[in-house]
Amino acid sequence: MILLKLYLTLAAILCQSRGTTSLDLDDLMTTNPEIQNEIINKHNDLRRTVDPPAKNMLKMSWDNIIAESAKRAALRCNQNEHTPVSGRTIGGVVCGENYFMSSNPRTWSFGIQSWFDERNYFKFGFGPTRAGVMVGHYTQVVWYKSYKMGCAINLCPNEPLKYFLVCQYCPGGNVVGRKYEPYAIGEPCAACPNNCDNGLCTNPCEHSNQYINCPDLTKQ
């Protein structure tokens, strides 16, 4: 099995938050089904709004095994390095990873939106529109082939940005050679007319790293 080579996405950093918040760590734990739904719904809502539109964007769903992997990553409190590939390979599939850190607790929707907002500095097919900006979180959030994910949060008291949020995405995005084309441009669901949910495809290829005829498999 040939593993996809991935570029690691850089970590999104939120400096000292303005104002106060009533959130605490327990409010953000991803063992809570309501938090899981918030995370998945936020991703799917954003994936539906990409511009230019995507014809092959898959619908995301929650996966508890991936969430456990994200939890292990969060518990490391290593905000400077992403999890080694061996630590985020699940079922033979290499998964992508996004980090978000903040000094005060923020909602998952806030962190996910911050990743997506990197699109303001991204041009499809070209990449970053200015030097020194991060776009890898955005391209992972909207990577068309990623369809399963899990997230976790940890409190890292020895870090200035102590609230550490981690999401992992399978299969991972930011594949070498096409990371600035995270999806195929076209009318929403044009690639999956019989398997569509409000602009997102619902026919993932679970054999993506094993078979070269995956496009045919997903039509069945």
From Swiss-Prot:
CDD domains recorded: CAP_CRISP
Modification after translation: Contains 8 disulfide bonds.
Keyword Signal among UniProt keywords: yes
Tissues where the protein occurs: Expressed by the venom gland.
Classification via Gene3D superfamilies: CAP
Keyword terms: Calcium channel impairing toxin, Disulfide bond, Ion channel impairing toxin, Neurotoxin, Potassium channel impairing toxin, Secreted, Signal, Toxin
Origin: domain of life: Eukaryota
Keyword Signal appears in the UniProt entry: yes
One Pfam family in the UniProt entry: Crisp
Positions of the SCP domain: 41-169
Subcellular location: Secreted
GO molecular function list: calcium channel regulator activity; potassium channel regulator activity; toxin activity
ShKT domain segment(s): 205-220
Disulfide topology: C77-C156, C95-C170, C151-C167, C189-C196, C192-C201
InterPro entries: Allrgn_V5/Tpx1_CS, CAP_dom, CAP_sf, CRISP-related, Cysteine_rich_secretory, SCP_CRISP, ShKT_dom
Signal sequence, start to end: 1-22
GO cellular component terms given for this protein: extracellular region
Family that this chain belongs to: Belongs to the CRISP family.
PANTHER family membership: CYSTEINE-RICH SECRETORY PROTEIN-RELATED
Function, as annotated: Blocks ryanodine receptors, and potassium channels.
Name this protein carries in UniProt: Cysteine-rich venom protein VAR5
Species this chain originates from: Varanus acanthurus (Ridge-tailed monitor)
